[in-house]
């Protein structure tokens, strides 16, 4: 089994879907390792736009089998709703190629209700979650009281565990805007529908051990990782290389490439430190031209300049063998482009390749920038590297040098599926 892993290297929304879509055309197996329906990306396949949340985007290829792995949390209604939406747009037979590990955890509507209550309780210190219940679901998993997908098939165990979960949250918060018996009734129907989708993950991989090309699709991104991200303003799963290996029990020696997807500037949804954020005309321009709205929440994304400190940190943890630089065309109309190259902490310490663990300290860093000339010409739809403006090529090559020679192998030049430069 030869494995390619695609990972977000910033705060998510980097455009992982397009490279995954491209690579999935040759893949025989595509897997999600972490997260739930809080993730979101858009793929333009032909003339049709597809939104993905919990499902692997390998479903756009009719030759690709898809697995939602053990490290994920699955909101069952969203799983079926998303499948139906894909098939309604022409992806016939998608359901027959979508499988869920029996060791994944179930994200209930109950978790969404609790998510809102927990965020409300934080007041001005809100994390800025998607409100999908992901955090409470992972909390239940870590506390050993969660419900696994495989347990849905055992009606007695499932109902007992869900009622116990509900009773625990009621004891904590009081009366909830949630009816546990209604949810149990809904799952009587879901139980029958889920039977062909639920698999023993180890047996599944043994069946597909001769897969010539396995693609692992990362969700969220390294800076949202529970351990390595800007804690506590993170998601609740391991979104980096280590999380993918563990959740899908990959043999590390089978990994042939690790692709880091990075936007040509930086964005973030929700709260938390963002050193290179531009609360000015430049930030507004990036937001408007880049159409920076979250696929899952619809919220405006915060925008700022490319941050090499964050990317060096991300590279040190995920060990990218190549990069996919996305949305280069959004920078076409800037006279000059800034790149963050170092931070200075309040105590005077200068950082170039790591970030402080304390989010409060990261919020207070002074950012050092270099200024590069813009190219002031259209790169939309460019397919060959040599056809890019000279200053655009210099921008890309500067990033490569500053990252120690990690090659930028793919460059996104527009929203369409084929708006991509592939460098050999």
From Swiss-Prot:
It is an enzyme of class 6 (ligase). One of its GO terms (cellular component) is cytoplasm. CDD domains: AdSS (cd03108). Its cofactor is Mg(2+). Pathway: Purine metabolism; AMP biosynthesis via de novo pathway; AMP from IMP: step 1/2. PROSITE patterns: ADENYLOSUCCIN_SYN_1, ADENYLOSUCCIN_SYN_2. One of its GO terms (biological process) is 'de novo' AMP biosynthetic process. IMP binds at residues 13-16, 38-41, 130, 144, 220, 235, 299. It catalyses: IMP + L-aspartate + GTP = N(6)-(1,2-dicarboxyethyl)-AMP + GDP + phosphate + 2 H(+). The keyword Oxidoreductase does not apply. It comes from the Eukaryota. The active site is at residues 13, 41. Binds 1 Mg(2+) ion per subunit. Mg(2+) binds at residues 13, 40. InterPro entries: Adenylosuccin_syn_GTP-bd (IPR018220), Adenylosuccin_syn_Lys_AS (IPR033128), Adenylosuccinate_synth_dom1 (IPR042109), Adenylosuccinate_synth_dom2 (IPR042110), Adenylosuccinate_synth_dom3 (IPR042111), Adenylosuccinate_synthetase (IPR001114), P-loop_NTPase (IPR027417). Keywords: Cytoplasm, GTP-binding, Ligase, Magnesium, Metal-binding, Nucleotide-binding, Purine biosynthesis. GTP binds at residues 12-18, 40-42, 301, 327-329, 412-414. It is found in: Cytoplasm. GO terms for molecular function: adenylosuccinate synthase activity; AMP binding; GMP binding; GTP binding; magnesium ion binding. Substrate binds at residues 295-301. Its EC number is 6.3.4.4. Homodimer. Belongs to the adenylosuccinate synthetase family. Plays an important role in the de novo pathway and in the salvage pathway of purine nucleotide biosynthesis. Catalyzes the first committed step in the biosynthesis of AMP from IMP. This is Adenylosuccinate synthetase. It comes from Emericella nidulans (strain FGSC A4 / ATCC 38163 / CBS 112.46 / NRRL 194 / M139). The lineage of its organism: Eukaryota, Fungi, Dikarya, Ascomycota, Pezizomycotina. The gene is adB.
